[in-house]
């Protein structure tokens, strides 16, 4: 099958009323949520409930290649029927995925989604409190509750939830039917641009402090050991109340093409 060129993300021209969906969430028993099978991919609580799964899936939340089978637990709830009916026979799986407060999904790629003719992954945020950050190719995807987004998750992505509330998305895998590909293309024109991560924004604020303060620049300029430079930069950020990681420092060093001390000279 010929490969189709897809964007990193696209907000589809679909919107959903949140109130009935949130009420339907409340009707799900607490014991129905199961831990995600990729236990090495996350820290904290990453759990889910399957609405539709492949009949040969080894676990309810795991992928499979068989025919889609609907779980019994939601058959009496019209809310889920109404939403899922809009995807017709393109729908291969549907899962509610919850990332608990203080939890994170480590960066990874879903390589099976990048193959020719592979399923298209859609996210419909239901609960997404401030403090949730979904990074795709290192940039925040500005998904809002009630929207529907296509995400190319064969690319590097990670999620963190720094809030005190759970983040819950309805995640759909769909066949690449023509109408869905058209909706993805149509949505690109109005898709908000991804933003730098909060850590990158914090790191850029530190750069501003260093550019204005020759003393800070000198403290870094005298360091010749890479690890010592990174550690000093992290401490400097902490002293200023700026949260970022060694990854942001290393990225700046790579962009500096080796002259990682020279880039800190006050200008």
Over which residues does each language-model region extend?
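Non-heme Fe(II)/2-oxoglutarate
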Residues: 1-87, 192-193
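Conserved short histidine dyad/triad with adjacent acidic residue
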Residues: 96-115
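Short, conserved beta-strand element in jelly-roll/cupin
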Residues: 98, 115-131
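A short beta-strand-loop-beta hairpin characteristic of the jelly-roll/cupin
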Residues: 106-107, 125-145
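Short beta-strand His + acidic residue motifs that chelate non-heme Fe in jelly-roll/DSBH
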Residues: 108, 132-134, 151-152, 156-163
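A short hydrophobic beta-strand segment most commonly corresponding to one strand
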Residues: 120-125, 148-150, 164-182
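Terminal, compositionally biased segments used for targeting/anchoring and flexible tails
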Residues: 182-267
């Amino acid at each position: 099958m010929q490969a189709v060129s897809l964007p990193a993300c696209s907000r589809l021209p679909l919107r959903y009323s949140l109130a009935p969906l949130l009420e339907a969430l409340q009707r799900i028993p607490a014991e129905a949520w199961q831990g995600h099978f990729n236990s090495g991919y996350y820290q904290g609580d990453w759990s889910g409930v399957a609405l539709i799964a492949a009949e040969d899936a080894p676990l309810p939340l795991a992928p499979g290649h068989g025919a889609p089978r609907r779980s019994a637990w939601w058959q009496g709830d019209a809310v889920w029927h109404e939403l899922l009916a809009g995807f017709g026979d393109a729908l291969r799986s549907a899962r509610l995925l919850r990332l608990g407060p203080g939890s994170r999904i480590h960066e990874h790629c879903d390589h099976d989604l990048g193959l020719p003719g592979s399923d298209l992954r859609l996210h419909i945020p239901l609960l997404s409190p401030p403090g949730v950050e979904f990074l795709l190719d290192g940039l925040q995807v500005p998904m809002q509750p009630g929207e529907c987004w296509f995400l190319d998750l064969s690319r590097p992505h990670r999620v963190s939830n720094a809030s005190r509330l759970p983040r819950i998305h309805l995640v759909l895998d769909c066949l690449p039917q023509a109408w869905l590909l058209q909706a993805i293309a149509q949505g690109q024109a109005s898709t908000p641009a991804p933003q730098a991560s909060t850590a990158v924004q914090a790191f850029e604020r530190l750069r501003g402090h260093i550019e204005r303060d020759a003393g800070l620049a000198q403290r870094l300029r005298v360091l010749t050991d890479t690890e010592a430079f990174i550690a000093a930069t992290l401490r400097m950020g902490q002293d200023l109340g700026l949260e970022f990681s060694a990854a942001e420092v290393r990225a700046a060093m790579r962009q500096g093409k080796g002259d990682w001390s020279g880039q800190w000279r006050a200008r």
